[in-house]
């Protein structure tokens, strides 16, 4: 006798009246009801979903970056390799996501822009924490989060804590590499800047990668990550220019001009310079 239509479909469970479903597990009711357009314009939904999904990916990036930093701090490098590789692949995902937002034309964005107020991706506290964990620190960037104590404290902690790269240098110092004293203990709220003793240590690693394999692998994971981050920043600039030209950003920055300056930021300067010096 044939089962009634809808019952026993490929032996899949179909009744979730007493068990957790896919939607329950993912809290889809909350997620899919978190989009609240402020304009009547059809295209605002794209704008909201683009930024919300980016924030979800950044949540995962932070999960991986914090764990990787802890691994390096605790002298356990191998697990960090997978975590950093995952962050790079997330960045690849975010690079491709700009293609979707780029379907919004200038007139479409102009129709909804008045409804955005002063809100801007510049104010993302998760993005700011990512920048700080990667060493691009600027204490002035705490101010946009002062109105939300929990966000402010989270970002401030990242500002005042050694970056992932700082922890790598400290790891190397614990394992016999020589550094200037201020590379090991300093004001961690200051951004990473080039240091000759740091480059010398990494050059030693790169000149004998077999002997220093774990550090060599870590360094290449850093380069992979910064490479992906640079691509994301470039697509950000070109997408913004394509949609709004050189208008000022909603958050008050000079828009494309500001984003172009960010292209010059180098997160791991010694790892790039040594390629010339090898």
UniProtKB/Swiss-Prot annotation:
Residues that hold substrate according to the record: 47-51, 109, 113, 250
Coiled coil: none
Gene3D superfamilies: 1.20.58.480
Keywords: Dioxygenase, Heme, Iron, Metal-binding, Oxidoreductase, Tryptophan catabolism
SUPFAM superfamilies recorded: Indolic compounds 2,3-dioxygenase-like (SSF140959)
This protein's record includes keyword Hydrolase: no
EC number: 1.13.11.11
A Pfam match: Trp_dioxygenase
A Gene Ontology molecular function term of the record: heme binding
Catalytic activity: L-tryptophan + O2 = N-formyl-L-kynurenine
Record flagged with keyword Iron: yes
GO biological process, one term: L-tryptophan catabolic process to kynurenine
Cofactor note: Binds 1 heme group per subunit.
Source organism superkingdom: Bacteria
UniProt enzyme class: oxidoreductase
Pathway assigned to this chain's UniProt record: Amino-acid degradation; L-tryptophan degradation via kynurenine pathway; L-kynurenine from L-tryptophan: step 1/2
Residues that bind heme: 236
Cofactor(s) in the UniProt record: heme
Cited NCBIfam families: trp_2_3_diox
Quaternary structure annotation from Swiss-Prot or TrEMBL: Homotetramer.
Biological role: Heme-dependent dioxygenase that catalyzes the oxidative cleavage of the L-tryptophan (L-Trp) pyrrole ring and converts L-tryptophan to N-formyl-L-kynurenine. Catalyzes the oxidative cleavage of the indole moiety.
PANTHER family xrefs: TRYPTOPHAN 2,3-DIOXYGENASE
Recorded family membership: Belongs to the tryptophan 2,3-dioxygenase family.
Stated name of the protein: Tryptophan 2,3-dioxygenase
Taxon lineage: Bacteria, Pseudomonadati, Pseudomonadota, Betaproteobacteria, Burkholderiales
Gene this chain is encoded by: kynA
